[in-house]
């Protein structure tokens, strides 16, 4: 795996004169190959030039399309709306007539004469409008599926935003040539078949592989290691230089060792790339925090101050996608229609099982203790109540692109994970602890596989066949029919009892519903608001009323954006070092110490039934 990028038409012409035996003339290559050139050197007004040479076309009329949606996103993207100045030229260089039938589609007559298509691509990061990906009217492309163009510095290439397909030619091979400045490199799971320092050439067997392989170009900030025969590449870009791959590598390596051990023979991934973009959170930068899974990589967006545990939480989820949907999936995913999609019924399976495993493996491998795992599940129960509990998950999944259904999507990470938990417990119970959900995934991967999808309607009957009637009844009642689940009942099977437990509050500036920060009268400074001494975080560091926040762990406070300081105080770890600079009565003061979190009591679970210890330990540890 190499981290470089490609060149454009000019380089093609130069190289063709010097290396004619290796670099064919643009119109004399393999007749079946779609050849794409992406120019990251000559960026025009924050736009990138793309040139596409078609395969041999034998139809009278051809459509060139950009995806309306891509796998794993569950929201309409319409990548074509970021493409402009589309032109078609015949093989002699004369411009041809085109008809743009919608934002994603260009139709060209006299297709056999087509020599190339050329267009400019805008990026998505600096146009995110705050409407959200999953709001009813939101049109923002989820940042990890988006694109970024920062000339000479950084490019995020989710290739669906740059490269389209010719209708009827999805299965044709692609040659993607990318020209880039020599001082930036591309992190990707792809192998560069070119040795030139300014050019990368990637060969892909079909269009779905193009969409499945993101590339991130930036000044080199990478780490590489091997886990159980799997090569892992981490690439990091931070505009402010606040995060580096070397700092994230130890925890990422520790986590991936644990994941490979947890999965055992089910996972046979040979190469895996992690592309981590660290957003400043400013209006012209990525807003959507999270990640998008691919077969051999993950594209992720984080926000400052980003910690290694943020990477672990996100990447642990995405890596488990190598099991589902990447290995076990329905025909709707295998034969994905990028412009007229039919969505699968089984988001609970693809996202819920994955999210559950990303939590379970941590207690299974000793990365967290049992009570911490119980608390994570309890929070999911609480969070799931923000959504419609009686909604059929199969109905929601198949209609997830309906604007009125979109707001239910985040529940796949809450109730979806809880469905997986209850399914795991049910399998453990009937098998007397010998089998669990991971065993079931192994059996399904044997029956199906990356190139052998299942029919949506057969998944639950097949799971019933592999397990027992009670498991099938659970899925029919709670997944298909949407009956609420009695979580207390299922957790009691493994010895847990509901009780009041203290939970850390997620933001140190808010406790018991009280805000402990405010803007001054001119909205130019962010101040501490200390109406009482109940905030343990403030009390421990000696923060006083009307202290002006200047820096938080070395990061400057953006007074124009109150949310930025709230984010700085989010999800901190108890007893970790912290430094806050405040201005108190005209004098800067550095307050140093350790994090003391605020806690709030809530419904949780603890192990209280010793007669269930064996089943409990088989559930958590086997």
Where in the sequence are the language-model features?
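Bacterial Sec-dependent N-terminal signal peptides
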Residues: 1-33
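Early extracytoplasmic/domain-onset interaction patches
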Residues: 25-69, 158
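Intrinsic-disorder/low-complexity, polar/charged segments enriched in Ser/Thr/Lys/Arg/Asp/Glu/Gln
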Residues: 33-35, 47-51, 61-63, 114-116, ...
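Non-catalytic architectural context of zinc metalloproteases
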Residues: 53, 76-85, 89-269, 287-289
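An active-site-proximal "capping" alpha-helix that borders the catalytic cofactor pocket
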Residues: 86, 259, 349-361
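Juxtacatalytic substrate-recognition/specificity segment
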Residues: 221-346
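Secondary-structure capping and boundary motifs in well-ordered enzyme cores
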Residues: 307-312, 342-350, 404-415
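C-terminal recognition in membrane/secretory proteostasis and scaffolding
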Residues: 358-359, 367-622
